[in-house]
């Protein structure tokens, strides 16, 4: 058991970011759980989340020079992770993009440090991979090298519509397409382990079978 990963799942449940019930995903699937990183919306919880990002990135052993946060959620995540890394003795620069180009002041769509060297893309989740693709294009256009993607939760489920499911997840497809690792703080296996270790009388324990069935239907190895 990776204690950091289990601590993250527990933290997400306690803050209401990870909820159990019946939810419809972007892909139209009925999921027994829902993860909404936008609910890390207080200073304390954001600081704790950034600690998880920073420590997981350090533990991964990935060599990198700076962070990039795609608009919009990635902006806060990359900024906070840079602060957490600095608190751990690793001072790195960060940048992010605007959705709309600015025609005054510094102009353009990029904000923050100049993109250079090996860049880690920081985001919350990967659904269709659109945000990653756009980030990779921007980083390469600046002459830098995207070296990894860091996300909070990997749902570990196959892409595509029912009846035409891919053999791979969106995370695996991103990794295969761009030849770089996608590192997550937690994933579906960690979530299931959390439910398996929950007391029989706990509120979460009753969702174990639903999550198992969902993983059986949509999960990847």
Curated annotation (Swiss-Prot):
Needed cofactors: Mg(2+)
Stored InterPro entries: OPRT (IPR023031), Or_phspho_trans_dom (IPR004467), PRibTrfase_dom (IPR000836), PRTase-like (IPR029057)
Entry keyword set: Glycosyltransferase, Magnesium, Pyrimidine biosynthesis, Transferase
Binding site for orotate: 34-35, 127, 155
GO cellular component, one term: cytoplasm
One example of a Gene Ontology biological process annotation: 'de novo' pyrimidine nucleobase biosynthetic process
Gene Ontology MF terms in the entry: magnesium ion binding; orotate phosphoribosyltransferase activity
EC number: 2.4.2.10
Catalytic activity: orotidine 5'-phosphate + diphosphate = orotate + 5-phospho-alpha-D-ribose 1-diphosphate
Pfam family, one: Pribosyltran
Gene3D superfamilies: 3.40.50.2020
Subunit structure: Homodimer.
HAMAP family attached to this UniProt entry: PyrE (MF_01208)
NCBIfam families noted in UniProt: pyrE
Family: Belongs to the purine/pyrimidine phosphoribosyltransferase family. PyrE subfamily.
Chain's role: Catalyzes the transfer of a ribosyl phosphate group from 5-phosphoribose 1-diphosphate to orotate, leading to the formation of orotidine monophosphate (OMP).
Protein name: Orotate phosphoribosyltransferase
Lineage: Bacteria, Pseudomonadati, Pseudomonadota, Betaproteobacteria, Burkholderiales
């Amino acid at each position: 058991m990776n204690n950091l990963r289990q601590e993250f799942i527990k933290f997400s449940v306690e803050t209401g970011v990870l909820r159990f019930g019946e939810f419809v995903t972007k892909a139209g699937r009925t999921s027994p759980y829902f993860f909404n990183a936008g609910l890390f919306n207080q200073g304390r919880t954001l600081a704790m989340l950034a600690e998880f990002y920073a420590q997981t990135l350090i533990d991964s052993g990935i060599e990198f020079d700076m962070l990039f946060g795609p608009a919009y959620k990635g902006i806060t995540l990359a900024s906070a992770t840079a602060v957490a890394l600095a608190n751990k003795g690793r001072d790195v620069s960060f940048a992010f993009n605007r959705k709309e180009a600015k025609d005054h002041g510094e102009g353009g769509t990029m904000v923050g440090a100049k993109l250079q060297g090996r860049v880690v893309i920081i985001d919350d989740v990967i659904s269709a991979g659109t945000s990653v693709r756009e980030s990779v294009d921007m980083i390469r256009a600046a002459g830098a090298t995207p070296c990894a993607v860091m996300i909070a939760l990997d749902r570990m489920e196959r892409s595509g519509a029912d009846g035409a499911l891919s053999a791979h997840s969106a995370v695996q497809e991103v990794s295969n397409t761009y030849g770089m690792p996608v590192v997550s703080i937690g994933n579906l296996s960690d979530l299931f382990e959390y439910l398996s270790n929950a007391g029989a009388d706990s509120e979460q324990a009753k969702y174990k079978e639903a999550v198992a069935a969902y993983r059986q239907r949509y999960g990847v190895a």
